[in-house]
Amino acid sequence: MANKHMSLSLFIVLLGLSCSLASGQVLFQGFNWESWKHNGGWYNFLMGKVDDIAAAGVTHVWLPPASQSVAEQGYMPGRLYDLDASKYGNKAQLKSLIGALHGKAVKAIADIVINHRTAERKDGRGIYCIFEGGTPDARLDWGPHMICRDDRPYPDGTGNRPTRTRADFGAAPDIDHLNPRVQKELVEWLNWLRTDDGFDGWRFDFAKGYSADVAKIYVDRSEPSFAVAEIWTSLAYGGDGKPNLNQDPHRQELVNWVNKVGGSGPATTFDFTTKGILNVAVEGELWRLRGTDGKAPGMIGWWPAKAVTFVDNHDTGSTQHMWPFPSDRVMQGYAYILTHPGNPCIFYDHFFDWGLKEEIDRLVSIRTRQGIHSESKLQIMEADADLYLAEIEGKVIVKLGPRYDVGHLIPEGFKVVAHGNDYAVWEKV
């Protein structure tokens, strides 16, 4: 087992050296679960926030699913080419928003929902399995032969799930991603989003529903500058209902996905391992933030260049609250992800709706000023129940927790440059 981990670590280091991702990336999720309800359209509304987002040092904005969808939020898409039926606004408004982002040197990330798809109409048996692509021609006009044959609610599918152990999405037909026509037409659609609409990269929704080998095809053939996958699986929990100390299998799954898609390319994954551990750690168990190997316990402890860290998103937080971060400790979460290696992602709600903009701005400014990046060196100085203290790149020190008598632990030449509810950040003078 030790040799296996040593080989994996060496492999990760070598891949990290060849990584083509920009080192100073800061992502921003530009919507929440209720954004579709906004009067006048969300795209138009977000246009008025572009200056603030760019001024904060954000490099990439993740936008909601743009295609026509049965579900208002966009996650039950049907006519993929139809960008005028979205609840967030029409195609012209979307392109104007992307143009405004590009004008501030900020890239636009599309939310790609391709694991499943809703049909336009029923077949002769009364089953919804006839798909419409949203164009006058036959692109993405599919039938039951494009549905996985093991998708029981939609019989007569002839395809196979790329990996039978992958997750099933019960609310809509699971698409057969091994079908050559499916691959070809989805690649064409992705390239259309990039060249015609201006998107720069992809966020793959429910990416655990199809294999990484298939995702590699879509990434390689659409050439995004950035891609991030949602691989959301459960952590390992003990009898007390809390995460086990060792979450190596969980983060290994994230690492494996990136390896298969292409470790030297633009592919990353959301670091759900770090999210789950951090959720619990800030509740008086900060010792969890040092793994058994002395490093960060999440994906950032193994392959930070390929990890997108976050505090909450439209699923875990917002109005869904599927896995929310403790609301009174959110800034501790940002103090962690914005000073640590990895690619941090800021959530719209926290930045604009929670009154945390100034504090988050300050942390991003420190990260940028000190050149903290996805592969910055992390030294964990202390990790006790009430104190987490770490030095990053020898330039920044961050403290989490209620303990205040830490002056003797701070080296000379550092001064406090940010502080808030149970967190503080020092910067080397």
UniProtKB/Swiss-Prot annotation:
rRNA processing recorded as keyword: no
Catalytic reaction equation(s): Endohydrolysis of (1->4)-alpha-D-glucosidic linkages in polysaccharides containing three or more (1->4)-alpha-linked D-glucose units
Enzyme class: hydrolase
Annotated positions binding substrate: 68-70, 75-76, 203-208, 232, 234, 252, 295, 301-303, 314, 320, 399, 404-406, 416-422, 426
Free-text remark on how the cofactor is bound: Binds 3 Ca(2+) ions per subunit.
Stored Pfam families: Alpha-amyl_C2, Alpha-amylase
SMART domains linked: Aamy, Alpha-amyl_C2
Entry annotated with the keyword Plastid: no
Cofactor annotation: Ca(2+)
Binding locations of Ca(2+) 2: E132, T135, D137, D141
Residues in the signal sequence: 1-24
UniProt binding sites for Ca(2+) 1: N115, A167, D174, G209
BP terms from Gene Ontology: starch catabolic process
Key words, A-Z: Calcium, Carbohydrate metabolism, Germination, Glycosidase, Hydrolase, Metal-binding, Signal
EC number: 3.2.1.1
PANTHER family: ALPHA-AMYLASE
Family in the record: Belongs to the glycosyl hydrolase 13 family.
Protein name: Alpha-amylase type B isozyme
